[in-house]
Each structure stands twice: as structure tokens, then as C-alpha cells.
Amino acid sequence: MGDKKTKVVLDADVINHFSRGGRLSLLPNILPEFQFIVLDIVKKELPILILADLDKVIKQEKTIAEEVFGGTSGEKKEYFRLTATSGPHLGKGESACMVYCRYHNDVVGSSNTKDITDYCKQYGITYLTTNDFLFYAIQRSLITKEEAV
């Protein structure tokens, strides 16, 4: 049995960026050493056309997997703390991604650095932005600098 791959847990903004650029199916190929997933909570935030593009990648290409968020009571409690109006009041998608990665030692894929940076630093969570993915795609000759603009 193979080693379990670290997951990149994609937030809506990264999915949006790559889908609108016509490159969503490229995303998992940029870092094939990782498993790419999207949480059910994040899917609910996506516009219908982006969701259709994502569903194609999930169902036909099978390079991004969908997972249900909230496997443990600790995850649920932390998620509600982050999204509560009396707490940091962060978005549902990025909160779910960060909590999932905190509890599973995975990587957040989000460009919403304003909302994720402090939490990720506090809990030692690695995160990658759209620009990071584009950088690696260029470095690995999957796209040109001109295509990344």
C-alpha cells in the first residue's frame, strides 16, 4: 500500500481563479505529489458555472476529490468559533479549509491571505496561494510566464 499523500485543501478563490482562466484541470498536475481536495462547504460557495467546471474535474478527470467537512467534534467546534459573529467572523470556506488542515496536517490552498495568514501561522499550517501555484506551474514548464498573467 502506498504512502498517504498530503492534501491541498482548495478554497473557492483558487478554484475560481483557475476555472476562470480555463486551467482548473491543470491545478492538480502542478503539484502531483499532493492530493487535491475540495470540501463540501467550499463547493456551496461557488457560482454555478465554476461549480460545473469543478464537478467535471471531480467526476470525469478524478484529479480533485470532494470530502465532507466536520469529521470530529473538535473540528466542528473550531469551525463555529471562527465563523461566529462574536468571534473572528471569517468566511465559511476558508474557515473549513483551515480547520481541516489544522486537524489533518494538510495544506490550505487559498489566496485570501488577509483572513488566513494569522491563523495558519498560529497553528503551523502551510498555505499556498494562486500565485504560488502559478510559480510552480512555470517552474515545472506546465505554463509560460505569459500564460500566468
Name each region found by the language model.
Residues 2-100, 104-106, 117:
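Active-site-proximal, substrate-binding regions of enzyme catalytic domains
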Residues 116-149:
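Acidic, PIN/NYN-like endoribonuclease modules and their adjacent C-terminal/linker elements
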Residues 110-111:
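Short beta-strand scaffold positions
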